[in-house]
Amino acid sequence: MSNARPQAGEKLRDDEKVKHIPITIMPTEKAEMLRKPEWIKIRLPRTTDRIDHIKKTLRKNNLHSVCEEASCPNLAECFNHGTATFMILGDICTRRCPFCDVAHGKPLPPSAEEPVKLAKTIAEMQLKYVVITSVDRDDLRDGGAQHFVDCINAIREHSPTTKIEVLVPDFRGRMDKALEILKNGVPDVFNHNLETIPRLYRECRPGANYQWSLDLLKKFKEQHPDIPTKSGLMMGMGENKEEIAEVLKDLRAHNVEMLTLGQYLQPSKHHFPLKRYVHPTEFDELGVIAKEIGFTHAACGPMVRSSYHADKQAAGVEVK
C-alpha cells in the first residue's frame, strides 16, 4: 500500500495501522510469543446457534459489536449468554492504539438510521442490560456525543426498562461540549477506560492523555452524582503491581466507583508486544486493594474485559 491517505471507509489493520505511531512496533516473531498459561481459557459453548443468531441480527441491521471488531476472547461466551457490546459510529477508528484490533482509517459519516436500528434490535433481542461503545471520532465536532445521546434516547423509547452502560472515548479537545450534550441522554453507568498506566501512554495510547481521561470521569460524576462511573485497565504491557495500585488511587481520587482489570492479549505479531501473563493471584490481590480504597465494584481477573458480564458487574456480582 502507498503512503497516500486512506479513502473514506478504507480499513487499515496490523502493520499498516501502527507504522505511523510515535514508537516503532517490531513484529513479534513466533518464537518470541509467550506461551499461554493454563489459566487463560476461552470458554466455548456446546452449540453456536445463539452466537450465529446474534451475528445474523447484527448483519441484518448493519450494526457492529466491539466483541467482533476488537477480537474479544470472550465473544463466544457473551454471545451465547445473549449479551453483546454494541459499537456505534462505525467500525473505523481515528486513533492508532497499537494494543487494539479495531481498524484505523477515515470513517464514514455517522448513520442517521443507526440509533433506531440499534434500539429496535435491542428490543427484538429483549436485552435487559446493554453496553454501548464507539470508535474514537476525532473527525466530529462533538466527538460523537450527540450520536450517543440519540442512541440512548432511542433505546429508552423502545425498551424503557433496559439498563444502559456507555463506554465512551475521551472526547479529545471537546470534553465540555460533549458533557453538555450528554446531559440530554444520561446512561445508567458511565464508563471510560484508562487502559494502562501513565508511563506507557505514549507507547500504548498515542493521542490520549492520562489526566484528561481522569478529568472526563470526574467532571461527569460532578454533573451526575447519582450515576456510577467506571474505568478499566489491561495488565501485561510492562507495568508492575505498584504502578497499577497508584492508578487505582488516582481513579478513586477522581470519584470513580467501578473497576475492571484484565489480561492484555496481543491481537497479532504487529501489535504492542505482550510482556507477561499476570497470575490470577495478582488480580485477586489488586481486587482486595481496590475494595480497601473504596471501589464499590471491582472485577479483576485474566479474562475480565470492560463489558464482560457488565450486567453482573453493575449488580455487584463477583466477576473474574
Curated annotation (Swiss-Prot):
Q: Which reaction(s) does its UniProt entry say it catalyses?
A: [[Fe-S] cluster scaffold protein carrying a second [4Fe-4S](2+) cluster] + N(6)-octanoyl-L-lysyl-[protein] + 2 oxidized [2Fe-2S]-[ferredoxin] + 2 S-adenosyl-L-methionine + 4 H(+) = [[Fe-S] cluster scaffold protein] + N(6)-[(R)-dihydrolipoyl]-L-lysyl-[protein] + 4 Fe(3+) + 2 hydrogen sulfide + 2 5'-deoxyadenosine + 2 L-methionine + 2 reduced [2Fe-2S]-[ferredoxin]
Annotated positions binding [4Fe-4S] cluster 1: 67, 72, 78, 307
Q: Which InterPro entries match?
A: Aldolase_TIM, Elp3/MiaA/NifB-like_rSAM, LIAS_N, Lipoyl_synth, rSAM
Task: Please list the residues that bind [4Fe-4S] cluster 2.
Answer: 93, 97, 100
PROSITE patterns, sorted: RADICAL_SAM (PS51918)
Q: Where is the Radical SAM core domain?
A: 79-296
Q: How is the cofactor bound?
A: Binds 2 [4Fe-4S] clusters per subunit. One cluster is coordinated with 3 cysteines and an exchangeable S-adenosyl-L-methionine.
Domain of life of the source: Bacteria
Q: Name one GO cellular component term.
A: cytoplasm
Q: Name one GO molecular function term.
A: lipoate synthase activity
Keyword Lipid biosynthesis among record annotations: no
- The species this protein was found in: Pseudoalteromonas atlantica (strain T6c / ATCC BAA-1087)
The protein's UniProt keywords, in alphabetical order, are: 4Fe-4S, Cytoplasm, Iron, Iron-sulfur, Metal-binding, S-adenosyl-L-methionine, Transferase
Q: What is its EC number?
A: 2.8.1.8
The similarity comment for this entry is: Belongs to the radical SAM superfamily. Lipoyl synthase family.
Q: Does the keyword Disulfide bond apply?
A: no
**Main location (coarse class):** cytoplasm
Q: What is this protein called?
A: Lipoyl synthase
